[in-house]
Curated annotation (Swiss-Prot):
Residues 14-23 have a biased composition (Basic residues). Component of the RIX1 complex required for processing of ITS2 sequences from 35S pre-rRNA. SUPFAM superfamilies: ARM repeat (SSF48371). It comes from the Eukaryota. This is Pre-rRNA-processing protein IPI1. It is found in: Nucleus. It holds the Pfam family Ipi1_N. InterPro entries: ARM-type_fold (IPR016024), Ipi1_N (IPR024679). Keywords: Nucleus, Ribosome biogenesis, rRNA processing. GO terms for cellular component: nucleus; rixosome complex. Residues 1-32 are annotated as: Disordered. Its main location: nucleus. The gene is IPI1. Belongs to the IPI1/TEX10 family.
Length: 381
């Protein structure tokens, strides 16, 4: 009976008494007060920089370093306008933050923007990487593994605009760390270019794969999209041409100066034929020059183990499939040239005549491509 009475009280309409105000609900909030400032705990106030008084001491550098770390999170903002403005901000600050510890955080957060959905963000990222390379190319070289990973992601991306813009990033990277890129991902990058351009690879290997065309997984819609965008196709052709010249003919072949000014009369100032003869006997310019031998790694390709358990050292890459080529190290120019001539040269040669016949920017680039292929054949392996 008591519970029934309590329930009825909830539905009873209270009677208003004369001279008394209306009773307020129990959960009412008093809004009669005034505040002079509002606290936003989810946002951080960022200063305009360490100019003037604090720029000359360690406190200014520390503040600038913390400011960069706070701004880096905006590169993952849901708004493409915010991401673009953040990239523009970092581009204007590169000269001051290029040697700060927070530069590593910036690179790790900005490189994934190669696959960003916004065209404007990707364009500004290319300008940012170019600015970083102009100030200190070693920053890009230290991040070559991450750069290679996201370059391949962009080349194989399901969204056609992201795939088309991959050549833009390749050209920027080749300007400052061409040698590192070709040594690290020679075969993967070549396969990626074939996928971006919609070409097929005709294998020239063993009897099982002889005369077999391997599609690179390009859909008809992406090929039509690339054909409609002649400008992007030309940019990817240029990127592929520069990449092949850097890998087969040397870093100096792409038209950029050597990164070491003390070697002006060294390897990069002579012809590629002389370069390949004596460069292997010079002191290497990069760390771990013999890592391609895999002396301290246990990695064997399928079917390359003998009965004694030792790995066969066959240098004939023509008998290897495209899947087995992934395990082949391409640290030296000789191996890269051999792999290119046996697996990629015939497929490229089949595509160039049609491009030259079409004319235009793509035709001129294809003509330069054809001249480069003839130059590669003239080099005695």
């Amino acid at each position: 009976m008591a519970k029934k009475t309590v329930r009825q009280q909830d539905f009873m309409k209270r009677k208003l008494k004369v001279g008394k105000p209306k009773q307020k609900p129990s959960n009412v909030t008093d809004t009669s007060f005034q505040m002079k400032r509002i606290s936003l705990p989810s946002q951080t106030k960022i200063s305009s920089g360490s100019n003037g008084k604090s720029a000359g001491n360690g406190t200014g550098v520390l503040d600038l370093n913390q400011e960069v770390i706070k701004r880096v999170s905006l590169l993952r903002h849901h708004s493409d306008v915010t991401r673009k403005e953040t990239v523009l901000y970092f581009e204007s600050m590169i000269s001051r933050i290029i040697h700060l510890p927070s530069m590593n955080n910036l690179m790790q957060s900005s490189i994934p923007l190669m696959c960003d959905s916004s065209k404007q963000v990707r364009d500004e990222l290319a300008n940012l990487l170019d600015t970083i390379g102009k100030h200190d190319a070693n920053v890009l070289k230290l991040q070559i593994r991450a750069i290679t990973l996201y370059l391949n992601n962009a080349m194989t991306h399901i969204i056609a605009p992201i795939q088309r813009d991959s050549g833009m990033f390749v050209q920027v990277v080749l300007k400052y760390c061409a040698d590192e890129l070709v040594r690290h991902a020679w075969i993967k990058m070549l396969k990626g270019f074939f996928q971006v351009l919609g070409w097929t690879i005709v294998t020239q290997g063993n009897n099982k794969a002889k005369g077999k065309s391997i599609s690179m997984g390009i859909t008809s819609s992406s090929v039509l999209s690339m054909n409609k965008n002649k400008k992007h196709k030309n940019e990817n052709l240029k990127a592929m041409l520069q990449f092949i010249r850097a890998g087969v003919l040397g870093a100096a072949a792409i038209g950029h100066e050597d990164r070491n000014p003390e070697q002006g009369n060294g390897a990069n100032s002579v012809s590629p034929l002389l370069q390949q003869r004596y460069v292997p006997y010079m002191i290497p310019e990069f760390p771990q020059p013999y890592a391609y031998l895999k002396l301290f790694t246990r990695q064997f390709a399928k079917g390359e183990l003998t009965s004694t358990g030792a790995e066969t050292s066959s240098t004939d890459s023509g008998n290897m499939t495209l899947e087995e080529l992934e395990t082949l190290s391409c640290e030296d120019t000789h191996t890269r040239r051999m792999v290119f001539n046996q697996h990629f040269y015939p497929s490229i040669q089949r595509q160039l005549p049609a491009l030259i016949k079409d004319g235009g920017e793509c035709g001129r680039t294809a003509h330069s491509f054809s001249s480069t292929l003839e130059e590669i054949l003239q080099i005695t392996v």
